[in-house]
């Protein structure tokens, strides 16, 4: 499907990327849409010991297999189905299971580093950065990681201060300059989301 529209959605952890993504998908009813979460593409670490895997910095660009993501995107854009990897967060490596993806009218690539890789950026028709206050982002991360991932509040805060925050400032925040659209206040900014989805609907209808 050479006329596939590719949308990139980036922003820090807890910024509201998922909310924005869901709003876009909801407003694109009538078009087929696929979501490729960048988290699917954490690198395989089966060659490392479990202890070594625990030391992986998942908030660094090197943690992601962008080559495979780019290859999958090219195949989908050319009308070919792909098998997308999944990640086992318990064993900290790639799972043996994959997810079958068919070509779609619209493909959304969502992740903290969605705009970091130039080759990936150049494939995108629309680049979005979800910009949310750091205090709100850490609060959302606290709720998510303690409730959904069973982590202690202390471990989440320590990880944020020692890894997440410095990686955000070094690698994620600078990608804001590549965005066509910046959405302040994340998913709660209904006006910005409405304007953005209207633009995307117009673009998709022309493809």
Curated annotation (Swiss-Prot):
Q: Which reaction does it catalyse?
A: uridine + ATP = UMP + ADP + H(+); cytidine + ATP = CMP + ADP + H(+)
Give the UniProt entry's GO cellular component terms: cytoplasm
Localization terms from the record:
Cytoplasm
What domain of life does the UniProt record list for this protein's source?
A: Bacteria
Q: GO MF annotations for this entry?
A: ATP binding; cytidine kinase activity; uridine kinase activity
**CDD domains cross-referenced by the UniProt entry:** UMPK (cd02023)
- The residues that the entry says bind ATP are 11-18
User: What EC identifiers does the entry list?
Assistant: 2.7.1.48
Q: Which InterPro entries match?
A: P-loop_NTPase (IPR027417), PRK/URK (IPR006083), Uridine_kinase (IPR026008), Uridine_kinase-like (IPR000764)
**UniProt keyword list:** ATP-binding, Cytoplasm, Kinase, Nucleotide-binding, Transferase
The protein's matches in Pfam families, at most eight in alphabetical order, are given as:
PRK
**Gene Ontology biological-process entries:** CTP salvage; UMP salvage
| Known pathway | Pyrimidine metabolism; CTP biosynthesis via salvage pathway; CTP from cytidine: step 1/3; Pyrimidine metabolism; UMP biosynthesis via salvage pathway; UMP from uridine: step 1/1
Per the similarity annotation, which family is this? Belongs to the uridine kinase family.
What name is this protein filed under? Uridine kinase
Gene name tied to this protein: udk
């Amino acid at each position: 499907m050479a006329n596939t529209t590719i949308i990139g959605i980036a922003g820090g952890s807890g910024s509201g990327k998922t909310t924005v993504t869901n709003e876009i998908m909801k407003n694109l009813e009538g078009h087929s849409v696929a979501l490729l979460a960048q988290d699917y593409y954490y690198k395989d670490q089966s060659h490392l010991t479990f202890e070594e895997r625990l030391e992986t910095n998942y908030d660094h660009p090197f943690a992601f297999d962008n080559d495979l993501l780019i290859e999958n995107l090219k195949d989908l854009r050319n009308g070919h189905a792909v098998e997308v990897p999944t990640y086992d967060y318990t064993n900290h490596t790639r799972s043996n299971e994959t997810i079958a993806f068919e070509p779609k009218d619209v493909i959304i690539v969502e992740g903290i580093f969605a705009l970091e890789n130039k080759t990936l950026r150049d494939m995108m028709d629309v680049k979005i950065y979800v910009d949310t206050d750091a205090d709100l982002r850490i609060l959302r991360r606290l709720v998510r990681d303690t409730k959904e991932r069973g982590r202690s509040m202390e471990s989440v805060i320590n990880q944020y201060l020692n890894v997440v925050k410095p990686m955000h400032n070094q690698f994620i925040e600078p990608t804001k300059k590549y965005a066509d659209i910046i959405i302040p206040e994340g998913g709660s900014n209904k006006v910005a989301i409405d304007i953005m989805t209207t633009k995307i609907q117009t673009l998709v209808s022309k493809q």
